[in-house]
Swiss-Prot record:
Annotated source species: Homo sapiens
Biological process per Gene Ontology, one example term: acetyl-CoA catabolic process
Residues at the catalytic site: 126 (acyl-thioester intermediate), 413 (proton donor/acceptor)
Pfam families the UniProt entry points to: Thiolase_C, Thiolase_N
Name of the protein described by the UniProt record: Acetyl-CoA acetyltransferase, mitochondrial
Gene3D superfamilies assigned to the protein according to its UniProt record, in alphabetical order: 3.40.47.10
GO cellular component terms given for this protein: endoplasmic reticulum; extracellular exosome; mitochondrial matrix; mitochondrion
Activity regulation comment: Activated by potassium ions, but not sodium ions.
Keywords: Acetylation, Acyltransferase, Disease variant, Fatty acid metabolism, Lipid metabolism, Metal-binding, Mitochondrion, Potassium, Transferase, Transit peptide
Outcome of substituting residue 93 to S: In 3KTD; decreased acetyl-CoA C-acyltransferase activity; less than 10% of the degradative/thiolase activity
Location(s), subcellular: Mitochondrion
Chain's role: This is one of the enzymes that catalyzes the last step of the mitochondrial beta-oxidation pathway, an aerobic process breaking down fatty acids into acetyl-CoA. Using free coenzyme A/CoA, catalyzes the thiolytic cleavage of medium- to long-chain 3-oxoacyl-CoAs into acetyl-CoA and a fatty acyl-CoA shortened by two carbon atoms. The activity of the enzyme is reversible and it can also catalyze the condensation of two acetyl-CoA molecules into acetoacetyl-CoA. Thereby, it plays a major role in ketone body metabolism.
Record-stated family: Belongs to the thiolase-like superfamily. Thiolase family.
InterPro entries assigned: Thiolase, Thiolase-like, Thiolase_acyl_enz_int_AS, Thiolase_AS, Thiolase_C, Thiolase_CS, Thiolase_N
Gene name for this UniProt entry: ACAT1
């Protein structure tokens, strides 16, 4: 060691080429070692969400940022920590037109967090809420922060119409719906997400009656879950104030009660008239809502004397051809399982976001997983799909629904051919 120390101290000119190379390699190894610290364990200490409102329904008077504030405040209160402990926040939000600058900043300050709290808004289309959790986890793992808030928010009821800037043409102007333009259209093939779902249904030979049956099952499961109190630990009430009228308190999801099973098989297909399979009943709906989780390192949980609900085990992103987005979660989920050395049989519960019934059926088919373990309390088809929120909602739901020691895997597709997946373990 004394010889090595002398070599490192000696001048470069006094060394032979061989010695110079040896010194460089020693310093490289030294540098590589110190740049790879042990990652910190990340735990979930609370997970809350607002009820999900129907399009132009019970929550339509509240912007996404207000819904986000309510979810964030609820999560911090459930965690039982001072707001000053939250060092940073990430929130998913897709349809930001007309919301004003920095939506996450609005949500965080609206929740009463300190002015000094850094905020970032994430847009990965429907995977935004989950990606926010993933990015917060990375920051916690590497020790950059020790307590964070992450989640997602969306108010599809408040998304504006737009027109192109420029001189007004003869004959009038054309307004475009930003829900469709920025949220539900495959920009590469210039088709609606539902047309992409039809393409996958054809490729995998998934018939309409299978999708209808799945949708009915989703509504049935959601109703049973609400009646059994399965959502009680995650949903916080929202008070809606209307000038000159009594306040309205929204306590439960609105969408799952708005179904007539007798009409499901009779509905016309939406995106493909001949031999189509996707209908308004077996697809998710347009909705409003927000979800938030308080994440922290295991060390921070000990310092703050809070009991973690679950730990984040692994996560991954994947991407396929844009038109094939419904099957992208298959690859993200497979990557997660491979990374941690688990088998699909080791997963007690799966949450596969129900953008369309087709998406879940395709993932069940390709992964060869037990349908009885998938979306056991319903999903986006029956509960609703506020697109920036859903990725956070399904992670939060697993956090409460799993039993101690069980693994749960949440996955969600996103426009452009992407997907995200996250594995958690109940503590």
């Amino acid at each position: 060691m004394a010889v090595l120390a002398a070599l490192l101290r000696s001048g470069a000119r006094s060394r032979s080429p061989l010695l110079r190379r040896l010194v460089q390699e020693i310093r490289y190894v030294e540098r590589s070692y110190v740049s790879k610290p042990t990652l910190k364990e990340v735990v979930i200490v609370s997970a809350t969400r607002t009820p999900i409102g129907s399009f132009l329904g019970s929550l339509s008077l509240l912007p996404a940022t207000k819904l986000g504030s309510i979810a964030i405040q609820g999560a911090i209160e459930k965690a039982g920590i001072p707001k000053e402990e939250v060092k940073e926040a990430y929130m998913g939000n897709v349809l930001q037109g007309g919301e004003g600058q920095a939506p996450t900043r609005q949500a965080v300050l609206g929740a009463g967090l300190p002015i000094s709290t850094p905020c970032t808004t994430i847009n990965k289309v429907c995977a935004s809420g989950m990606k926010a959790i993933m990015m917060a986890s990375q920051s916690l793992m590497c020790g950059h922060q020790d307590v964070m808030v992450a989640g997602g928010m969306e108010s599809m009821s408040n998304v504006p119409y737009v027109m192109n800037r420029g001189s007004t043409p003869y004959g009038g102007v054309k307004l475009e719906d930003l829900i469709v333009k920025d949220g539900l259209t495959d920009v590469y093939n210039k088709i609606h997400m539902g047309s992409c779902a039809e393409n996958t249904a054809k490729k995998l030979n998934i018939a309409r009656n299978e999708q209808d049956a799945y949708a009915i099952n989703s509504y049935t499961r959601s109703k049973a879950a609400w009646e059994a109190g399965k959502f009680g630990n995650e949903v916080i009430p929202v008070t809606v104030t209307v000038k000159g009228q009594p306040d309205v308190v929204v306590k439960e999801d609105e969408e799952y009660k708005r179904v007539d099973f007798s009409k499901v098989p009779k509905l016309k297909t939406v995106f493909q008239k001949e031999n189509g399979t996707v209908t308004a009943a077996n697809a998710s709906t347009l909705n409003d809502g927000a979800a938030a989780l308080v994440l922290m390192t295991a060390d921070a949980a000990k310092r703050l004397n809070v009991t973690p609900l679950a730990r984040i085990v692994a996560f991954a992103d994947a991407a396929v051809e844009p038109i094939d987005f419904p099957i992208a979660p298959v690859y993200a989920a497979s990557m997660v399982l491979k990374d941690v050395g688990l088998k699909k049989e080791d997963i007690a519960m799966w949450e596969v976001n129900e953008a369309f019934s087709l998406v879940v059926l395709a993932n069940i088919k390709m992964l060869e997983i037990d349908p009885q373990k998938v979306n056991i309390n319903g999903g986006a088809v029956s509960l609703g799909h506020p697109i920036g929120m859903s990725g956070a909602r399904i992670v939060g739901h697993l956090t409460h629904a799993l039993k101690q020691g069980e693994y749960g895997l949440a996955s969600i597709c996103n426009g452009g051919g992407g997907a995200s997946a996250m594995l958690i373990q109940k503590l």
